[in-house]
């Protein structure tokens, strides 16, 4: 049986925290900032934790990430 490969796109987008959760960045942060409020832009700066529903699938893609 061949080894499970890490999904490289996912490896660039997610980081594992010390407690084993997955950190991600927010969407809507690349352009068109004039249409967004200061409050919205400030909230988008912080990273977020992957939700429980997505965690299992993403964890499989990151099989070899420590």
UniProtKB/Swiss-Prot annotation:
Keywords in alphabetical order, please.
Ribonucleoprotein, Ribosomal protein
Compositional bias (Basic residues) = 1-26
Q: Extract one GO molecular function annotation from the record.
A: structural constituent of ribosome
Q: Which GO terms describe its biological process?
A: translation
Q: Which domain of life is it from?
A: Bacteria
- What would be one Pfam family of this protein? Ribosomal_L35p
Disordered as annotated region, ranges: 1-42
Which SUPFAM superfamilies has this protein been placed in? L35p-like
Q: Does the keyword Ribonucleoprotein apply?
A: yes
* Gene Ontology cellular-component terms listed: cytosolic large ribosomal subunit
Residue ranges of coiled coil? none
Q: Which family would the database say this protein is a member of? A: Belongs to the bacterial ribosomal protein bL35 family.
- The name this protein carries in UniProt is Large ribosomal subunit protein bL35
Q: Kindly list the organism's lineage.
A: Bacteria, Bacillati, Bacillota, Bacilli, Bacillales
**Its encoding gene is what?**
rpmI
């Amino acid at each position: 049986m061949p080894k499970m490969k890490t999904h490289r796109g996912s490896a660039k987008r997610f980081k594992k925290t010390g407690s084993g959760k997955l950190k991600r960045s927010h969407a809507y942060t690349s352009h068109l900032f004039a249409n967004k409020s200061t409050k919205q832009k400030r909230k988008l700066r912080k990273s977020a934790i992957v939700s429980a529903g997505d965690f299992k699938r993403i964890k499989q893609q990151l099989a070899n990430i420590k």
